[in-house]
Regions:
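Domain-level signature for soluble enzymes in the chorismate/prephenate branch of the shikimate pathway
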Residues: 1-380
């Protein structure tokens, strides 16, 4: 036999597999009707374990890993089909539908907005991209921004979530597990760092540089060229610029924005010192209540999964089975649980798609703890 003969044999086997798979799914549909009539849940974990064990007993040892992966996917597809036929369960899809109906058609042009830092911060630039006429209130910490939303001091809050060079803002992710909020929009801001100092200062005389840890990370290559300079972290790039201006010293500088240069009367000793030219930070806009504006095509979730093998795989398989694209997966350790994590997901799917509604009805059953953070669009 030559290669073409082997391929024809594979084609013949595939024809049989398709017919058998269709037959299996038809039987799964009958099981779904039985479960509907008898008030049974779609997922029967014990049955799946027993079935997988029986399959492994019948499978040659060198193929068990492959058969296990194959049937894990078949089980997932079967559950997805049954869930689709039985309709969504739980109250989350209904809450989302209600929010879509009650949310105004247009995103607000003006609002009270909480930001971390001081005037000139990149968060302020994000506010101005999101709102035409924001009333911006500055707070000393990320946690204070979350608290301002929870207490009703501001309707919205703007927080940095990730940077294209330095990665995730871990402090914000950790706080997300501790507060009640909803994401209503996001925006990407181009970040251009400059070395700012008081008028008359010279680069060769600089002994200390202040900035936020993310900015320091984004300018690592530039800072390596200044080995005798002490780099000091502070709360915010705008705070760093203000500290330098208020110090009156000619031997200190800040990594900050051009806006802060003009705002605080500083000179730029070096421009665009970030490692990557295309350096963007993604900010989220949070609110106390769920607001879903037209065009929402991104959804954020947090989950605590059962602490056993395959838990994350089952969630990812559910995304795959429904054709939902995942843009981001982040894990953060949970302080009160040894070696357990909170998983953060960004999904790309329209809130109007039937697979989105089905997914929101199914996911809570796969988790120990599930948080729907919101569905929104991103300003780019």
């Amino acid at each position: 036999m030559d290669l073409n003969d082997y391929r024809k044999e594979i084609d013949s086997i595939d024809d049989q597999l398709i017919a058998l798979f269709a037959q299996r799914m038809e039987t799964a549909e009958k099981i779904a009707e039985y479960k509907r009539a008898n008030g049974l849940r779609v997922l029967d974990a014990r049955r799946e374990k027993e079935k997988m064990r029986a399959l492994m007993d019948k499978t040659p040892e060198d193929l068990r890993e492959y058969v296990s992966s194959l049937y894990s996917l078949i089980f997932e597809l079967s559950r997805s089909r049954q869930s689709c036929l039985l309709g969504t369960k739980g109250d989350l899809p209904a809450k989302i539908a209600e929010a879509i109906e009650k949310t105004p058609q247009l995103f607000p042009e003006d609002a009270a907005v909480a930001c971390q830092g001081v005037e000139g911060a990149y968060s302020e630039q994000a506010c101005e991209r999101l709102f035409k006429r924001p009333s911006t209130f500055f707070f000393s910490s990320f946690e204070a921004v979350f608290s301002a939303i929870e207490k009703g001091l501001c309707r919205y809050g703007v927080l940095p979530l990730e940077n294209s060079t330095a990665g995730s803002v871990n402090a914000v992710y950790d706080l997300m597990t501790q507060h009640n909020f909803r994401i209503v929009r996001s925006v990407r801001i181009k970040v251009d760092h400059n070395l700012l100092a008081n008028p008359g200062a010279k680069l060769e005389n600089i002994r200390e540089i202040y900035s936020h840890e993310q900015a320091i990370s984004q300018c690592a290559h530039f800072l390596q060229g200044l080995p005798n300079v002490k780099v000091i972290r502070c709360e915010n790039t705008a705070v760093a610029a203000r500290m330098v201006a208020e110090s009156g010293r000619d031997d200190v500088a800040a990594l900050s924005s051009r806006a802060c240069r003009d705002l605080y009367g500083l000179d730029s000793l070096a421009a665009s010192v970030q490692d990557q030219g295309n350096n963007f930070t993604r900010f989220i806009c949070i609110a106390k209540n769920l607001e879903i504006y037209p065009g929402a095509d991104r959804t954020s979730l947090m989950m605590v999964l059962p602490h056993h093998p395959g838990s994350l795989y089952k969630v990812l398989s559910r995304f795959n089975a429904l054709g939902v694209n995942m843009n981001k997966l982040e894990s953060r350790p949970m302080p009160d649980r040894n070696f357990e994590f909170m998983f953060y997901f960004d999904l790309e799917t329209s809130v109007y798609a039937p697979q989105f509604t089905q997914l929101m009805g199914e996911l809570p059953e796969l988790c120990e703890d599930f948080s729907y953070l919101g569905s929104y669009s991103e300003v780019i």
